[in-house]
């Protein structure tokens, strides 16, 4: 796979510390051929890493990979302002805006361009088709137009502009200077600088950047799609102008690995178009790969001109890797045992809270299926997360978590694991890892059974959304608080999980709250719960 098409994109999310996105090769496949087009060599119009380094084989077109410099102070007519220096510049740059779009080709007076010694290009700029050319940039000082000098690379790009590879300056204060543009030129009529694939045109008396009509390219590697790995969807963005150059016109059809997941490309800013894929294991035939640290979603975006494929198909393979946490692990599970609750907070919108059962202390491996079957010594991990809403302001608090022998959350037989936001201190197997500190809460408990021939255990948690700006969210627990009266529970804010049964027991015979005639004969060693004990805590 040519490294030219590799691109890493970071996406800062409230609920993820890091999102790693990898865009694989975009390949055009002609009818009857399944092999992607490979780049066998790189010409003079591509910039590659230094020979002998790991980046030696990484090449790209600087006309499509540069930093915009919209800095009016670089104008050769500017004789005011503080004295700046470009010593720390490194990479490919394009000058835009009122200050000018090209470096000066003649010696510039000292103390112009907001610097002491202005730098100018000694020679003429290359023409389109010349590729990347080597030039000398000179700095005017002490009566010498080339008192300091350094090498720069320049390339002429489609669209009538140049890009420059600048690696600092020989001294300070030196700065690269540009010739201000003529305000009457067409380029100045567009508020934003047009990209190489665009031209500045007037449509209905309004100037803007539109796709060039003369684009005709067979180089699929110039497409360079962009990838945005979001919390709920993956977005692939493609340059609309370059699609047109590859023969894919306005009515292009897009579909993922599941042909039923098809749609017309959505229009983005600056002549880009996009298609989204949900971050779900079973959606649109996503391929889900999972290791110890990440869940990786893969799919392929196919672009064609018609449902009847006669010409070119453009396939874009993409993947997003998400660090595993509670939320990502639930998305990656096909059938997690999970409970959801919509909660409205006056003046702050609607929130979604989810609670699930996990198999380990990392809370990244949820139980799946219809029920959980555990051995005697098993520890059950319970995690809850505030998924939707203002998680920067509201913290999730588990006020009361309790077990019942039936699925009825109002069952009189209750064993409290958490009461009044504090853990049951009489049960040494209960560990509350987090409660009220963030948008997540989690606790663990060794499993048990109820006396009285009940086969099943159900878990229930009453939640509270705590406004961290106006409330003390983290519980302050003491033994006197733990022994307080039985709390009043708001059943409208209770999440339910279960049933849970002991491994080796008969199939659950109770789903409606009626005890099975074939109940457990021996209580699990953790605790033997009776109706009386349920109310003692």
Swiss-Prot record:
Maturation propeptide residues: 513-537
Signal sequence coordinates: 1-28
Disulfide bonds: 48-59, 63-157, 85-172, 107-145, 113-177, 138-146, 190-200, 194-209, 211-241, 229-320, 261-284, 401-461, 422-477, 466-473
Main location: membrane
Keywords: Cell membrane, Cytoplasmic vesicle, Disulfide bond, EGF-like domain, Endosome, Glycoprotein, GPI-anchor, Immunity, Innate immunity, Lipoprotein, Membrane, Receptor, Secreted, Signal
Keyword Iron appears in the UniProt entry: no
This protein's domain notes: Each ZP domain consists of an N-terminal (ZP-N) and C-terminal (ZP-C) region connected by a flexible linker; the linker allows the ZP domain to wrap around the ZP-C subdomain of the preceding subunit.
The protein, known as: Pancreatic secretory granule membrane major glycoprotein GP2
Species the sequence originates in: Homo sapiens (Human)
